[in-house]
């Protein structure tokens, strides 16, 4: 009795009565069991996938499921993410260097033309502060 209690009872729909008992047995044999599905989910070698026994046993359906689903999102690998991050950081540092050199070029040109650009900016800031103080009174 203790052994009988450990057996798992699966509820299955009653088969149509018009089928022959031999056909029912063949259908039952073709149906994958949970253990079979678990085994198929594991990565199997290509030799196993091509074996004729597997197709004869009705397990060939899993080969279709091995194809990637075009709608499913596959996240990038860790190496791909690292490459993306490195290229992003590189582009940021390149932008920073280019902007700094462009600003230096502009300042040099302005100084050559006699414009003390930095002093003008400070004066503009002072004017804005004075206007804000007048507005608040």
From Swiss-Prot:
GO cellular component: cytoplasm
Acidic residues composition bias: residue spans: 118-137
GO annotation (BP), single: intracellular signal transduction
Locations listed in the record: Cytoplasm
Comp. bias regions, Polar residues: 88-99
Pfam families listed in its UniProt record: DARPP-32
GO molecular function list: protein phosphatase inhibitor activity
Modified residues (Phosphothreonine): 33, 74
Keyword annotations of the record: Cytoplasm, Phosphoprotein, Protein phosphatase inhibitor
Residue ranges with Basic and acidic residues bias: 40-62, 108-117
InterPro entries: PPP1R1A/B/C
Phosphoserine: residues bearing it: 44-45, 101, 136
PTM annotation, UniProt: Phosphorylation of Thr-33 is required for activity.
Spans annotated as Disordered: 1-137
Family: Belongs to the protein phosphatase inhibitor 1 family.
Role of this protein: Inhibitor of protein-phosphatase 1.
Protein name: Protein phosphatase 1 regulatory subunit 1B
Lineage start: Eukaryota, Metazoa, Chordata, Craniata, Vertebrata
Gene field: PPP1R1B
